[in-house]
């Protein structure tokens, strides 16, 4: 079986209220060369049933975990795609052609990492503002001295270079993960 270009990974835990918007944003994508993995931490609020009813979802795993980053590692291990996209419950792609634009960029430059900006929106998807920390024109390991300049939702990584999240970091394992990905990138 041929590998999909993207593995979209959504982490959930009792996310019945926020998951539907995330699912809709994936279902609306015009680019469909992806697998969509839901990794759930044994929700009790109907999250799993909601995920299972989405035609876009390839796989739903629901079992206890040790928190967000443990669940993200489970998604990493299960992913088959060439690139990883973490889009957690409550997150959404900006436009229906977001994956297409990323795929076009990948086709032109064959990068290890693709990154972008993050827009903050309200529950009705109305624009609030751009994220306070903006991504630089050219991202490097040194860029992270200024903080987490790129949200992990806007940080798409070639699966082969992606390490697992370090579970010693309870709150900022994504910051550490992005730096380690940058160190592995060509």
Predicted regions and their residues:
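Conserved donor NDP-sugar-binding/catalytic core segment of glycosyltransferases
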Residues: 96-128
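Short aromatic/hydrophobic "clamp" motif used to bind/position activated sugar donors
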Residues: 84
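Cell-envelope/extracellular polymer assembly enzymes that use nucleotide-activated donors
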Residues: 4-7, 35, 176
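Acidic helix N-cap motif at the loop->helix transition within catalytic regions
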Residues: 17-20, 45-53
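Glycine-rich, basic loop-to-helix element that forms the pyrophosphate-binding segment
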Residues: 62-79
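N-proximal low-complexity "stem/linker" segments adjacent to membrane-targeting elements
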Residues: 1-28
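Conserved nucleotide-sugar donor-binding catalytic segment
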Residues: 130-186
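A conserved acidic beta->alpha catalytic loop
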Residues: 32, 40-49, 88
């Amino acid at each position: 079986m041929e590998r999909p270009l993207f593995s979209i990974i959504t982490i959930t835990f009792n996310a019945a209220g926020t998951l539907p918007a995330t699912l809709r944003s994936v279902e609306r994508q015009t680019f469909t060369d992806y697998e969509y993995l839901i990794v759930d931490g044994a929700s009790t609020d109907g999250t799993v049933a909601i995920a299972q009813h989405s035609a876009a979802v390839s796989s739903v795993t629901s079992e206890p975990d040790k928190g967000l980053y443990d669940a993200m590692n489970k998604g990493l291990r299960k992913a088959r795609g060439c690139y990883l996209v973490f889009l957690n419950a409550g997150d959404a792609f900006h436009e229906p052609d977001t994956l297409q634009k990323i795929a076009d960029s990948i086709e032109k430059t064959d990068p290890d990492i693709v990154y972008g900006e993050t827009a903050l929106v309200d529950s009705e998807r109305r624009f609030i503002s751009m994220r306070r920390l903006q991504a630089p024109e050219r991202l490097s390991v040194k860029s992270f001295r200024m903080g987490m300049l790129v949200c992990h939702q806007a940080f798409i990584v070639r699966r082969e270079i992606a390490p697992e999240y370090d579970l010693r970091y309870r709150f900022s394992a994504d910051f550490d993960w992005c730096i380690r990905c940058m160190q592995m990138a060509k």
